[in-house]
Amino acid sequence: AGKSVWGSGFLPSVYQGVQCRSDGEPVLFINNPDDISSDERKASIAALSDINKLHYDEFKDPDILTRISQYELAFKMQTTVPEVMDIASESEYIHNMYGSNPHKSCFANNALLARKLVERGVRFVQLFDWGWDTHGTSESGSIDIGLVNKCRQTDKAVTALILDLKQRGLLEETLVVWGGEFGRTPMQENREGKTNSF
């Protein structure tokens, strides 16, 4: 996966995604540069937008429209991202339900963040969970321990996400798709894992 999955595919580039990181700054470069006030930033984005619109009128390049919308989105995100990304303010009940922990990186935090994004009107949210490569080279990669733990963590978080969406009346207008792409053969390897299916 990685940055390649955040593109817009065959759609105009204005539809590409914004990657939220689980460690460090959630969205890179969201804050104003040092010594630049919010008003100065807003004025510079407005000036850039005007220049880009003139450029678009002349060249009709759809990537220019993308650039305009990205600058505008980035400015709007400066005020909303810090609050939305703050899962520490959620109740103890919610953290217990999801299995989330604001002080460490985990899939449950991302599931809780997904609910917060849906609440804010984000139209498409995609979660990834890594570490499913159960070849049995370690305890965390074994079928009887590692795979069971991974399933337990994701099952709890996804169940909580669906229940939380339902309790808040958001599930009626939210399509939840759960899928995977990493298949294994039914044959056991000579270690505690299974081989790739391709």
Predicted segments with their positions:
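Ligand-binding pockets and gating/stacking loops
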Residues: 1-198
